[in-house]
Amino acid sequence: MLGRIRLFLFKIKKSINMNFELTEEQLAVKEAARDFAQNVLKPGVIDRDNNQRFPVEEIKQLAELGFMGMMVDPKYGGSGMDTMSYVLAMEEISKVDASASVCMSVNNSLVCWGIEKYGSEEQKQKFLVPLATGEKIGAFCLSEPEAGSDATSQSTTAIDMGDYYLLNGTKNWITNGSSASTYLVIAQTNVELGHKGINALIIERGMEGFIVGAKEDKMGIRGSDTHTLLFNDVKVPKANRIGEDGFGFTFAMKVLSGGRIGIAAQALGIAAGGFELALAYSKQRKAFGKEIYKHQAIA
């Protein structure tokens, strides 16, 4: 019986043709990301974090590498890479600078992916291209003061005024809050319809009534600009709505599902970077006559 089971498992493995080795392209992306993290991000990362300084120039260089629109079709200015390449790049960047990687993650996983997957051709040409090339940075606006990231409990409203929506409300804890130029905002259009009355709108910096509010003084990832956003009678053209009327909730759920891949890769990178630093320190620090890594509690 055991032999039959082994033979069965062998046949399954052979038929699936499992291959967990990285391709040459993926290895090249990983190496490029590692080199960039070590040589460009690492020298100033402590200063940026201490002073809450957004890595403006560093993000521009990330864009030059094609890392701000990694999975976007080249016809829209992206790099056309696969998800694994994106994950590998996120890990390497996050090992050194989580502030740079979270900006990269939001732009790739949430904003670029959301517009490419569900936006109109006009929206892709107008908004996706500059986001994928890194000319502009995007932000995803869902969380609210009294609702957190519960997409079904939106207090921000987008009232249908015929040719446009009138947007009012507040969004909190928005990554890339002050550095972004393009914002995906989730808002309630029809309260009676519940989650089926929610829309996703593309907001541009400079729209009248749109204000970037207070910056959060965070414990970590301080180089990332996390802000409150205020919308006071902002007129949003109907052309800026993503998908059909009432598609906003589904859009948010789909986009967040993809976004979890980037954030998981970031968490893995942060953990790996922390381990590498701790290991190096344990070989330098001495206590009781020997390096601390030789003590049982650490070894």
Please describe what each predicted stretch is:
Residues 102-122, 148-151:
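N-terminal glycine-rich flavin-associated loop
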Residues 131, 146-149, 173-176, 190-192, ...:
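Short Gly/Pro-enriched turn/cap motifs at secondary-structure boundaries
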Residues 164, 168-212:
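A short core secondary-structure module
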Residues 134-142, 186:
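A short, Trp-centered hydrophobic/proline-enriched beta-strand micro-motif
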Residues 5, 9-105, 122-126, 130-133, ...:
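Amphipathic, small/basic residue-rich leader segments at the start of a protein or domain
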Residues 156-159:
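A structural signal for short hydrophobic beta-strand segments in well-ordered beta-sheet cores
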Residues 19-29, 91, 95, 210-299:
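Glycine-rich beta->alpha junctions and the first turn(s) of the following alpha-helix
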